[in-house]
């Protein structure tokens, strides 16, 4: 697989990905929400398998899972969990023949790829007619409090196009053009995440999220540093708040 310059690999964060993304617990919760939408008798390909936390959850529920990831280091960690069923490959160049996959899933992938329309078309190529593709989208959900508002505004300043939000409408339009029918859309819960504003500020400075990786010093000073300062200046900044983590699932079927 050739890595295109605009494709985003998580190679640099593979060693701390699980610790910053909820690990196997969140993977199991995600898998539980996907399971009822999949055929337990058919293998599942996870496109963008990462370290395998969701795939592990699906396997524990009785599914046969295989997957691909752009990052060799992430794929290596997935193999430790799942065995030799993980390949290094680009979501835009899947290493499978036409119409050979029965069902596929992608969790938190489409906002990271160079061109979601290309990836959706590639998954459609690989799926059999009638096969399902479950994917997730961030959507356009308004911030629920001042912490989320500060994060929302920061991301909008860093990406004024709003592409990071992975708007459902954009995903659905691209999916239909790729040969999919929209079967279902739903919002599930991955449970509550306790965090204080100060903890969020600390996490930002650790740069765990991909949109923080390649900022210039000027961007950091102009956008990120003021956000960190504002988070720490909130009243009771060291008191934890509880946030429900939504999982917005789109169910597509290959025509």
Q: What kind of region is each of these model predictions?
A:
Residues 105:
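A conserved beta-strand element that flanks and buttresses the S-adenosyl-L-methionine
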Residues 1-42, 53-57, 74-77, 132-163, ...:
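Conserved class I S-adenosyl-L-methionine
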Residues 51, 166, 181-255:
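Conserved Class I S-adenosyl-L-methionine
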Residues 45-47, 51-93:
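Class I SAM-dependent methyltransferase SAM/SAH-binding core
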Residues 108-112:
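Short catalytic micro-motifs in class I SAM-dependent methyltransferases
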Residues 117-129:
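A short glycine-rich, Lys/Arg-flanked "PGG" loop and its adjoining helix->strand segment in the class I
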Residues 163-178:
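Short alpha-helix
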């Amino acid at each position: 697989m050739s890595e295109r310059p605009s494709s985003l690999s998580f190679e640099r964060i593979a060693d701390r990905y699980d610790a910053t993304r909820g690990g196997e617990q969140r993977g199991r919760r995600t898998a539980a929400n996907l399971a009822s939408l999949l055929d337990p008798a058919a293998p599942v390909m996870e496109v963008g398998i990462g370290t395998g936390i969701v795939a592990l959850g699906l396997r524990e529920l009785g599914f046969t899972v295989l997957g691909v990831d752009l990052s060799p280091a992430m794929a290596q960690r997935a193999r430790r969990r799942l065995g030799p069923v993980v390949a290094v490959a680009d979501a835009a160049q899947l290493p499978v023949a036409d119409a050979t996959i029965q069902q596929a899933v992608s969790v938190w992938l489409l906002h990271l790829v160079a061109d979601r329309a290309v990836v959706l078309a590639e998954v459609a190529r690989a799926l059999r007619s009638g096969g399902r593709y479950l994917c997730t989208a961030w959507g356009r959900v308004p911030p629920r409090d001042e912490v989320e508002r500060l994060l929302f505004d920061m991301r909008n300043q860093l990406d004024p196009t709003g592409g990071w939000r992975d708007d459902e409408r954009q995903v659905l339009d691209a999916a239909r053009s790729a040969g999919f029918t929209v079967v279902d859309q739903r919002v599930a819960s991955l449970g509550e995440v306790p965090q204080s504003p100060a903890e969020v500020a600390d996490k930002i400075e650790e740069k765990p999220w991909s949109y923080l990786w390649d900022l210039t010093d000027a961007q950091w000073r102009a956008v990120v540093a003021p956000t960190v300062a504002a988070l720490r200046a909130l009243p009771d900044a060291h008191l934890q708040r509880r946030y429900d983590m939504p999982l917005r699932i789109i169910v597509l079927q290959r025509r």
